[in-house]
């Protein structure tokens, strides 16, 4: 919810689109989608997942390969570069400073503030954001043991016209 609110609160666009669609190519895996739906509802109270049978998938994705789908209206996709640039502009607009290309070697709390040691000096801050992906090993070994790396997969094509994109993904889900 916060990710959806940030762009409008700070007046930037990151091409956020609601909705995520899991699909199954293999008939034997269709049952997993219904298991996920059941688990999400009963374990986490997430009742919004919707099972999409093969007959209805053409409304979502222009492919005959998929056997079934599971739609999550709470998921979504965005342009990560636009998000990063928008957040950076919001931070700087609020008086914050961003220290790029400053490898953090360590940090500590001191007098209610943070002191970050870099290769070229120290940075003092009231707020510290560890935006290090899953690679915190040397910076914060304790926190690193709590982080699970997540794979991200992206595909790039030649730019598609609006008409081509809509033909491939009529639902505009990822």
PLM features per residue range, with description:
Residues 19, 102, 120:
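Short, well-ordered beta-to-alpha junction loops that form the rim of enzyme active sites
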Residues 8, 89-99, 124:
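Secondary-structure boundary elements
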Residues 49-51, 98, 154, 174:
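Conserved beta-strand scaffold positions in the cores of enzyme catalytic domains, especially
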Residues 51-63, 97-114:
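A conserved short coil-to-beta-strand element within the FAD-binding core of flavoproteins
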Residues 81, 94-97, 108, 131:
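Extended non-membrane alpha-helical scaffolds
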Residues 1-90:
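Rossmann-like flavin
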Residues 106-174:
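Flavin-dependent oxidoreductases
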